Amino acid sequence: MAQINCIDGDLSGNLVRISNAIEEATKKLADIILFPESALLGWINPEAFRRASPIPGKESEIICQLARKYKIHICIGLDEKDGDRLYDSAILVDDNGNIILKHRKINVLPELMAPPYSVGEGVQAVQTRFGTIGVMICADSFRDNLLESMQKKKPDLLLIPYGWAAPENAWPAHGQELIKVVKKAAIKINCPVIGTNLIGQVSHGPWTGQIYGGQSVAFDPATNLLLIGKDRDKDLIIISLNLNN
């Protein structure tokens, strides 16, 4: 879990922090690294309508190059431009630098940005050498129907980039709510769930000023393994899992 500091609109700086986290993770022999939601431009940032790229495109190719360079699987949330539409997307890139899965967020919370993100269709999972890996994004994990759809795909691992924010005075307690959400998803789908949050602050829309407080969560229902990232500080959490592949 790469719980990094993401600064809204600081695309080049966020790429530096992403690259540094990947380099550190490979030194710790990680096979897969999971970053937060909208890790390049920031969640609910209307500037993304102008600055985001298609997928595949310029920014996703940089992620693919990093995967090839460091021989690691990367899952990351990226804003995706498709014509006039903007999607809150996530990609899974294999260690050869190929995008093997792209998910577009479905539960986009349209009241938080005008115009809002476009709504994705369906959940997906892909076969890898580690087993079947599914990907959802943040508030997708709130919806029972989406968890049920993912359950039917029988993933061995579910990766969820989060943008988990709350007012400053709600932290650190707000991290307990993320634990509940991740645990519920893991128990419902019957596989380990990894949820990576970021460090930062919402800078646009009605949630302006709210804090992304970290406390990323990994939970394995088979072993009751629970790992939690640092409160309101960057962290790189290494998890060892025996997947059912």
Question: Model-flagged regions — what are they?
Answer:
Residues P56-C75, F142-D235:
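CN hydrolase (nitrilase-like) catalytic-core segments centered on the catalytic cysteine
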Residues K81-L157, P161-Y162, P167-K184, R232-K234, ...:
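Active-site catalytic loop in hydrolytic enzyme cores
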Residues L11, S19-N96, K102, A165-C191:
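Cys-nucleophile CN-hydrolase/nitrilase-fold catalytic domain and related Cys-dependent amidase chemistry
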Residues G13-E23, R143-E148:
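Short, acidic/polar
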Residues E37, L78, I137, Y162, ...:
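A cross-domain feature marking catalytic cores of carbohydrate-active enzymes
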Residues M1-N5:
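Short beta-strand segments enriched in small/hydrophobic residues
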Residues C6, L40-L41, R143:
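Active-site micro-motifs of SAM-dependent methyltransferase domains
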